[in-house]
């Protein structure tokens, strides 16, 4: 937790992500877009899901990963996708089959990396987010050519950008997303 208070450097984030990716041994599944969804929505509905699904309907293979329940009073992607008619994947094989069928698949952190899933759930116990909240957005487990990450606190933008660069991500976009998810604030000015 001291690392979180001090704030992780981009080098530390890149090292955490590299170690995680080495541990995962994720299969080689072709995806165009890695979309992380870890924050949950507090003020608005997760409209970004509609954008991801429209991309999928138009031939873009979107892999979304995230976590739910770690922060109270949030609406998480895992809760909304079934309401939109999209089942949550539980294995890499399901991810591959679903991507081949509809170009969109979601896999939770609990499913693809249970140790990090357990740590992220300690948020309410410890009273603050852990470095896992930061590094999970950068994992890009299927090594997509393009990665989307949202941060809530602008101070994290630079560390995410530099970590992505150190990880060799060619096309990585980091924005201050509404509620920490990858979408602009619908109430904000353009």
Residue ranges and their predicted role:
Residues 13, 44, 73-74, 184:
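Alpha-helix N-cap/helix-start motif
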Residues 34, 59-60, 78, 139, ...:
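Generic signal for short, ordered secondary-structure residues
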Residues 1-44, 56-58, 62:
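Acidic, glycine/proline-rich low-complexity segments that act as flexible tails and inter-domain linkers
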Residues 43-47, 127-130:
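Short secondary-structure boundary/capping elements
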Residues 46-95, 100:
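A glycine-rich phosphate/pyrophosphate-binding beta-strand-loop-alpha-helix module
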């Amino acid at each position: 937790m001291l690392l979180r208070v001090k704030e992780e450097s981009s080098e530390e984030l890149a090292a955490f992500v590299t170690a995680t990716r080495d541990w995962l041994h994720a299969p080689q599944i072709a995806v165009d877009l890695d979309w992380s969804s870890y924050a949950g929505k507090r003020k608005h509905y997760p409209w970004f899901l509609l954008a991801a699904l429209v991309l999928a309907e138009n031939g873009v293979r979107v892999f979304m990963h995230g976590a739910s329940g770690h922060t109270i009073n949030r609406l998480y992607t895992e809760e909304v996708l079934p309401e939109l008619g999209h089942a949550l994947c539980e294995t890499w094989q399901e991810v591959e089959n679903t991507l081949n069928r509809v170009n969109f698949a979601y896999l939770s952190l609990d499913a693809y990396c249970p140790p990090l899933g357990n740590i992220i759930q300690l948020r309410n116990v410890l009273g603050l987010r852990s470095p896992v909240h930061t590094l999970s957005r950068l994992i890009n487990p299927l090594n997509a050519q393009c990665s989307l990450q949202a941060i809530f606190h602008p101070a994290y933008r630079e560390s995410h950008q530099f970590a992505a660069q150190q990880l060799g991500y060619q096309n990585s976009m980091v924005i201050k997303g509404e509620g920490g998810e990858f979408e602009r604030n619908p109430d904000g000015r353009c």
